[in-house]
Regions:
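Conserved ABC transporter NBD signature motif
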Residues: 56-67, 71-72
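Conserved ABC ATPase "signature" region
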Residues: 96, 100, 107-125
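Catalytic Walker B motif of ABC-type/P-loop ATPase nucleotide-binding domains
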Residues: 154-158
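Helical segment within the ABC ATPase nucleotide-binding domain
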Residues: 168-181
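ABC ATPase "signature
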Residues: 213-214
Length: 235
């Protein structure tokens, strides 16, 4: 599904990501954790083609993001850490805009928008300007837009920030359903309890370098993920 080999990205003399390699297989929810500035967002933006990286290779279903970015982007969805996008649109205009980009048919988009807007209790707000949305409403809109074209791979940067408990529960269910159907999820989070309960695998990044990765048992053993993370951060 997603293969990252020796990814390196520098800003001037500082390496934001340094020789990072990971593989996310179909059916996996893969968590990506690290302190602020560790390189998580740079990695995610490199995967989805927003940032040009200096060296290494990223492939999605064997397709290089550098060689054929459009083919890769058709297979993925990306939820950034800041959902403040296209605020001049209404909610429904934005969702239709995303559906247009991915060539979703009128019937399919209508059905999917209705399904997810009802789930997230956003139906009555779709005609409103996005500028009037709360942070949580913008995050829900971003989630709906990510699922609208049924991507193979969903990349998310801190997706639970701003969500109420009900919406968080719904998102977790959608993530598991996506993977049960052969898709994959790769997401960053600071909520270690969520990562520990939800993820099949997890990677810990520090100073741009991968310091531990694997199944939850491989990463944490008999300890809590929080204890392991804090111990590694202190080294």
């Amino acid at each position: 599904m997603l293969n990252i080999q020796h990814l390196t990205k520098a800003y001037g003399e500082k390496k934001a990501v340094d020789d990072l390699s990971l593989h996310i297989a179909p059916g996996e929810i893969y968590g990506f954790i690290g302190h602020n500035g560790a390189g998580k967002t740079t990695t995610l933006k490199s995967i989805v083609g927003i940032l040009q990286f200096d060296s290494g290779e990223i492939t999605i279903d064997g397709i290089s993001i550098k060689a054929d970015p459009l083919a890769c982007k058709r297979k993925i969805a990306y939820i950034p850490d800041n959902p403040d996008l296209y605020e001049f649109m209404t909610g429904i205009q934005y969702l239709n805009f995303i559906a247009d980009i991915f060539g979703v048919s009128a019937n399919d988009r209508q059905r999917r928008i209705r399904k997810y807007a009802d789930l997230f209790e956003l139906t009555d707000d779709l005609a409103q300007s996005i500028a009037a949305y709360s942070h949580g409403m913008k995050q829900k809109r971003a989630i709906i837009s990510a699922w609208i074209h049924e991507p193979r791979l969903v990349i998310m940067d801190e997706p639970f920030v701003g969500l109420d408990p009900k919406a968080s529960h719904l998102l977790k269910g959608m993530m598991r359903e996506k993977c049960d159907m052969g898709g994959a999820i790769f997401f960053s989070t600071h909520v270690l309890e969520v990562a520990e309960k939800l993820c099949d695998k997890v990677a810990i990044i520090k100073g741009g370098q991968l310091i531990r990765s694997g199944t939850m048992d491989e990463v944490k053993g008999d300890d809590s993920l929080e204890d392991v993370f804090l111990e590694l951060e202190g080294e």
